[in-house]
């Protein structure tokens, strides 16, 4: 059986930016917060059903009283290429997870979504659920405030500005599984 903690360090790196509480080493932005760690991603394939997994994780988070959700994933390309999203689909309503994200935001939860890592590729655009209404979509900049080449960009198909904010995502100190 695979070790989910060793398969990918991205979640741990993001968590360390938020929750690390070792003043002698690193202090995150919310060091006193408590966390539920939920994983919905199948790292080895891309299928529409992963949006169902994500929606179930978000519903679980709601059921246990989570106030803020950070999600560092998004989808636009699938193993079955006929399911790939088009730019016109980035309207906050087409993708299941975008509708779910809006629903969660309407309930009063804060949902923070990555803009995506497609800025240097042919897609370039943000990915669902980052196109959803009332979610905070975050792009990446370097320490000189220059947009990271990998950071996906907006706008949405219905002309909303995304990402909403940017944060340092290049050259940041983070905790990783490989030390």
Across the structure, where does each feature detected by a protein language model lie?
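Glycine-rich, acidic and aromatic/proline-enriched surface loops and short helix-turn segments
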Residues: 20, 67, 71, 167-171
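Subtilisin-like serine protease catalytic core
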Residues: 1-50, 64-67, 80, 106-108, ...
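Anion (oxyanion) recognition and catalysis
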Residues: 62, 102-106, 166
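Short acidic, glycine-rich surface-loop motifs adjacent to enzyme active sites
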Residues: 61-91, 114
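Active-site glycine-centered loops adjacent to acidic/histidine catalytic or metal-binding residues
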Residues: 101, 116
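Solvent-exposed loop/turn segments at secondary-structure junctions
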Residues: 41-44, 75-78, 117-121, 141-145, ...
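Extracellular S/T/G-rich loop segment that most often corresponds to the catalytic His/Ser-adjacent loop
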Residues: 1, 127-179
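Hydrolase catalytic cores
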Residues: 15-18, 38-42, 125, 169-179
